[in-house]
Amino acid sequence: MDEGTFKGKVVIAPEVLMTIARLAALSVPGVARMAAVPGGVNRLFQRRPYNEGVRIVVHEHTVRAELHVVVSPGSNMRDVAERVQHEVARAIEQMVGMDVEAVNVHIQDVEYSDAGGE
């Protein structure tokens, strides 16, 4: 059978896109961790899922991502956010082949140590 003659479709679960986006964001220097999505149902039940901090909306063949991050102290927040946008879009386009409409980055906090005076 020649390539391209198969019938059917490929469905990518939103959880896959969330994992790709989360890992891409965490790979950016200056991202300390993901933050809880405000108003998310997982927060109500005190669960911290592997896809925390990521919302994905898929419309046909286009992806829109919302990422909530906590940055490391001393990081340039604008640079970190722009790098997250670039890395998440690149990862989704490269790994899944879907178009990325937008990557919105919400910086929720700065990760400071609880040790006083350090």
Residue locations for each model-derived region?
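Contiguous, often N-terminal, cationic amphipathic patches that form binding interfaces
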Residues: 1-73, 77, 82, 98-118
